[in-house]
Protein backbone atom coordinates (compact mmCIF):
# COMPACT_ATOMS: atom_id res chain seq x y z
CA UNK A 1 0.00 0.00 0.00
CA UNK A 2 1.23 3.47 -0.84
CA UNK A 3 1.78 5.81 2.11
CA UNK A 4 -0.01 9.14 2.16
CA UNK A 5 3.37 10.90 1.96
CA UNK A 6 4.37 9.00 -1.17
CA UNK A 7 0.91 9.59 -2.61
CA UNK A 8 1.19 13.34 -2.02
CA UNK A 9 4.47 13.43 -3.93
CA UNK A 10 2.94 11.45 -6.79
CA UNK A 11 -0.13 13.69 -6.73
CA UNK A 12 2.03 16.79 -7.12
CA UNK A 13 3.47 15.22 -10.27
CA UNK A 14 0.04 14.25 -11.67
CA UNK A 15 -1.79 17.55 -11.09
CA UNK A 16 -0.23 19.42 -14.05
CA UNK A 17 -1.51 16.72 -16.40
CA UNK A 18 -4.81 15.71 -14.82
CA UNK A 19 -5.77 18.67 -12.60
CA UNK A 20 -8.75 18.06 -10.32
CA UNK A 21 -9.02 14.50 -11.62
CA UNK A 22 -5.73 13.72 -9.84
CA UNK A 23 -7.17 15.01 -6.56
CA UNK A 24 -10.36 12.96 -7.00
CA UNK A 25 -8.21 9.95 -7.88
CA UNK A 26 -6.24 10.40 -4.66
CA UNK A 27 -9.49 10.40 -2.70
CA UNK A 28 -10.52 7.12 -4.36
CA UNK A 29 -7.12 5.53 -3.74
CA UNK A 30 -6.95 6.69 -0.11
CA UNK A 31 -10.44 5.36 0.61
CA UNK A 32 -9.53 1.84 -0.55
CA UNK A 33 -11.69 1.86 -3.66
CA UNK A 34 -8.91 0.54 -5.93
CA UNK A 35 -8.29 -3.19 -6.34
CA UNK A 36 -5.58 -4.87 -8.41
CA UNK A 37 -6.85 -7.76 -10.53
CA UNK A 38 -3.81 -9.10 -12.43
CA UNK A 39 -1.01 -7.67 -14.53
CA UNK A 40 -2.01 -4.20 -15.76
CA UNK A 41 -5.71 -4.59 -14.83
CA UNK A 42 -7.33 -2.83 -11.89
CA UNK A 43 -10.88 -2.17 -10.69
CA UNK A 44 -11.92 1.19 -9.28
CA UNK A 45 -15.19 1.88 -7.52
CA UNK A 46 -16.20 5.34 -8.64
CA UNK A 47 -17.84 8.05 -6.57
CA UNK A 48 -21.32 6.98 -7.73
CA UNK A 49 -20.74 3.29 -6.94
CA UNK A 50 -20.08 2.16 -10.52
CA UNK A 51 -17.02 -0.05 -10.97
CA UNK A 52 -14.61 0.78 -13.77
CA UNK A 53 -11.88 -1.36 -15.29
CA UNK A 54 -8.52 0.37 -15.68
CA UNK A 55 -5.72 -1.02 -17.82
CA UNK A 56 -2.42 0.74 -17.04
CA UNK A 57 -1.44 0.44 -20.71
CA UNK A 58 -4.76 1.40 -22.32
CA UNK A 59 -6.63 3.55 -19.77
CA UNK A 60 -10.08 3.41 -18.22
CA UNK A 61 -13.41 2.34 -19.69
CA UNK A 62 -15.36 5.19 -18.04
CA UNK A 63 -17.16 7.78 -20.19
CA UNK A 64 -15.04 10.82 -19.14
CA UNK A 65 -14.29 11.90 -22.68
CA UNK A 66 -13.03 15.31 -21.53
CA UNK A 67 -10.16 13.84 -19.51
CA UNK A 68 -6.77 15.00 -20.81
CA UNK A 69 -4.70 12.52 -22.82
CA UNK A 70 -1.01 11.84 -22.42
CA UNK A 71 1.47 11.35 -25.27
CA UNK A 72 0.32 7.73 -25.64
CA UNK A 73 -3.35 8.67 -25.99
CA UNK A 74 -4.32 7.38 -22.53
CA UNK A 75 -7.09 9.44 -20.88
CA UNK A 76 -6.18 10.57 -17.35
CA UNK A 77 -9.61 10.32 -15.70
CA UNK A 78 -9.90 10.16 -11.89
CA UNK A 79 -10.01 6.35 -12.02
CA UNK A 80 -6.76 6.14 -13.99
CA UNK A 81 -5.16 8.62 -11.56
CA UNK A 82 -6.38 6.50 -8.62
CA UNK A 83 -4.71 3.42 -10.09
CA UNK A 84 -1.48 5.29 -10.81
CA UNK A 85 -1.39 6.41 -7.18
CA UNK A 86 -2.32 3.00 -5.75
CA UNK A 87 0.27 1.29 -7.95
CA UNK A 88 2.96 3.77 -6.92
CA UNK A 89 3.58 4.94 -10.49
Which ranges hold each PLM region?
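Long, low-complexity, compositionally biased intrinsically disordered regions
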Residues: 1-89
Amino acid sequence: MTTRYAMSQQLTRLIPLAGFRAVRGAELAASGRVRHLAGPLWLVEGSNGAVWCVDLAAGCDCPDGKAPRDGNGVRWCKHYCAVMLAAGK
